[in-house]
Amino acid sequence: MTIKNVLKLAALLGVLALVQAEEQTYRMCVPQKYYEDCLNLLKDPSEAGIRMECVAGRDRIDCLDKINQRKADVLASEPEDMYVAYHTKNSDYKVISEIRTQEDKDAAFRYEGIILVKKNSNIHSLKELRGAKSCHTGFGRNVGFKIPVTKLKNAHILKVSMDPELTATERELKALSEFFSESCLVGTYSPYPETDRLLKKKYPNLCALCEKPEQCNYPDKFSGYDGAIRCLDKGKGEVAFTKVQFIKKYFGMVPGVTAEGDPSEFEYLCEDGSRRPLNGPACSWAQRPWTGYISNVDAVSGDEKLHNLQHRLEKFFENGLHAENKEAASHLLINPNAVYHSKPQAVDPKEYLEKAGYKDVIERDGSAIRKMKMCVQTDVEMQKCDTMRRAAYSREIRPEIECVQEKDCILAVKDNKADMVAVPAQNYKEARDGKLKPIVYESYGPNNVYVAVVDSALTKENLQSMPIHYNGQDHRAEKAAAYLNKLRGINTCQTTPSSEKNIMIVNAQQLEQYKNKQLLCSSLDKKPVTEWQSCNLEANLPVGVFIRETMTPVEQETMKHLFVSLSDKFGSKGKLPDVFTLFGQYKDNVHNVLFADDAVEFVTELKNPNTNEQTYNGLKCDTNTIKKN
């Protein structure tokens, strides 16, 4: 073969490789709950010819695992998801592009946290912030709380007590209260109203600069990004913690915005103690990176592969902006104000986060006492616990969870080898005998209770002895039937499903089809089907999280807060159920791992009068317990 022919062949192979790359179908992983949205978006006429396909993951954590296992190519992810990717063993993730906003499409970061002081201020270093009057966006928020606490702690300027008698939250509040003379730090310090009230009463100087110190919550004209600046400009503050974009808006440094203050009277305070004018580049001490797309090395190795995937994503993204189904697009992080931005090179998640100084913010310990050990028994429980641990830590839920696997978890908690265990109804008594106590329970939602449906014509005498129709495979329905039998003086151990449908045990969620019937209450009186809340026979105990009775009050409060936080973030009603599926099916063909699939949240007390340990124990006819592996 001549050199000329070799060159022709090489050129032809190059063209074929390019065509093959162009024709490759890329697999975008999306959480299961948004899978239909992804399919609908790809059906949109605007997406015609875009070679993308949707792959369903249980949640974002599962999608990351699928990318690592080469079962998917790309995922739209937030910085916290990138943190999970960075800490995944044997992984080679790459951040390849960003989702920016129209207003800040040229900005390297989504936002920059800064320190703002008055030009005539005597504060010229981080140390000199001690004793100052501080203005914050709000409790628990990034630039106004987490970043200042993290940075000042890391600089060994803010001293946080490790007093075991204080909760992690109170330790930080106490530290800020002692560091600043007065502040405006609005927000909910605790999910429990009484605890929130007591904390604000104990540290009143944290609310002293607010518009309404006695309320110390939203709305307040000195809260939020612009409110923190206003607290410094119009209030009594001496330093504000906010972000650059709102500095520009507040001082009228963006077109079409009326200034609220004079920018020449204020300066940025830098970490090294220097100052910068507001009309120049800011010196931020931490930034939040952009949301973006994450892939793996195989999909983006070499410029050609990288650019091809980026080009395909850009077309998908641009078309998504013009899609008819805007809601479906938004679930895939394609919002009307968004702009797609390709990275010049694929970047490791660790490098991406460290460049912004955001890794430290995620890793802030929250002044937690220690890691809390959750005991599990089976391999699949261990897998779910570890997934929960990864998701929780990345979303700054503290204390950190550590998963341990034991044959007998109740004994492990009793013997101090673990701190907590999820206990099903049939093992409450064993847990109580082991000196354990519940701190939270799973809840199935307000109308997910079992009721007895009857004909309105049936007399009380009829109802006293008629057999009960129910699903014998449904443990909750079985307990409701047993409870009704006990109320009627019938031996609960002889409860079996009947084919007769005079009395039917059904879930209140199905009552629409029984609206011509009535409910039979625990008093054996009848009520309309609309009265299911007070007239139900729910007697099964939900899964409870048990801890040692001997744990200190602070430890107990910390554990309770941990699970309430998990529920608030990842429960069915939570803010981020697509990040981690706390409740719901964890794996194909595997149900009720640690918690029930149909649970929706954790609650701290059982409010249904029928649902209590005494009633449940009175219905027992067997010795079913957790099997010891």
From Swiss-Prot:
Residues 1-21 form the signal peptide. Fe(3+) binds at Y111, Y225, D408, H561. GO terms for cellular component: early endosome; extracellular space; plasma membrane; recycling endosome. Disulfide bonds join C29-C63, C38-C54, C135-C231, C184-C210, C207-C216, C270-C283, C375-C409, C385-C403. One of its GO terms (molecular function) is metal ion binding. InterPro entries: Transferrin (IPR016357), Transferrin-like_dom (IPR001156), Transferrin_Fe_BS (IPR018195). Gene3D superfamilies: Periplasmic binding protein-like II. Residues 26-366, 372-621 form the Transferrin-like domain. GO terms for biological process: iron ion transport. The keyword Lipid metabolism does not apply. Keywords: Disulfide bond, Ion transport, Iron, Iron transport, Metal-binding, Repeat, Signal, Transport. Hydrogencarbonate binds at T137, R141, V143, G144. It holds the Pfam family Transferrin. The keyword Transport applies. Transferrins are iron binding transport proteins which bind Fe(3+) ion in association with the binding of an anion, usually bicarbonate. This transferrin binds only one Fe(3+) ion per protein molecule. Transports iron ions from the hemolymph into the eggs during the vitellogenic stage (oogenesis). Monomer. Belongs to the transferrin family. This is Transferrin. It comes from Sarcophaga peregrina.
